[in-house]
């Protein structure tokens, strides 16, 4: 088969070579098509004037139970719940809602970020991702899709593709999981951490010994998470 293929190539190219004429065997084409993104999201912007460099931004991805078209469902857990109860964060919080039957798509989330950045004064060196359960998976996936865009990520009770570990070695990562999680085993998070470590990265991981699937409540109520995030900035290309 290999020999036959080589012969065919020579036969087909021979007239081109002998003719002395330049023949373009491959044409260049460009697809330009706008793809509609129809996802609603919550945005919380601090009331104060933004810092000179702009507001940091945290993207929050909810779990499977909050999918749908009722945006109020997004307020059930995590930062949106805290904000609804009066919590004031010193950064912009963006909380999209994934339509039912769909999953978190990186290109859609990137489009949302672009739109929010266009409409607000945002420090693009301090953009963070966090999410719980399905949103934890979405956090890993989006970070691997565009690791150079983010300053830090905090996936909670999620998991990802361990082959992506090498893409995340320069990204600050703090992972959270409950040891007794029967929905998404803690091994999903542990394997991602191990993959990053094997590739040369240094992620953090917190395993709550007596927590089940809901380890996000105590995580999002812990001020240390936000302090850690806000101390991280996107790496410059020269630092890589």
Predicted regions and their residues:
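C-terminal catalytic histidine-bearing segment of alpha/beta-hydrolase fold enzymes
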Residues: 172-240
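Gly/Ser-rich "nucleophile elbow"/oxyanion-hole loop immediately N-terminal to the catalytic nucleophile
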Residues: 47-53, 101-134, 147
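Active-site machinery of serine-nucleophile hydrolases
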Residues: 57, 61-110
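Primarily recognizes the serine-hydrolase "nucleophile elbow" in alpha/beta-hydrolase
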Residues: 117-119, 125-169
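Sec-dependent N-terminal signal peptides
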Residues: 2-17
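A domain-start/cap signature at the N-terminus of enzymes
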Residues: 18-57, 91, 130-132, 137, ...
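Short, proline-enriched alpha-helix->beta-strand connector loops that line the catalytic pocket
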Residues: 89-91, 168-173
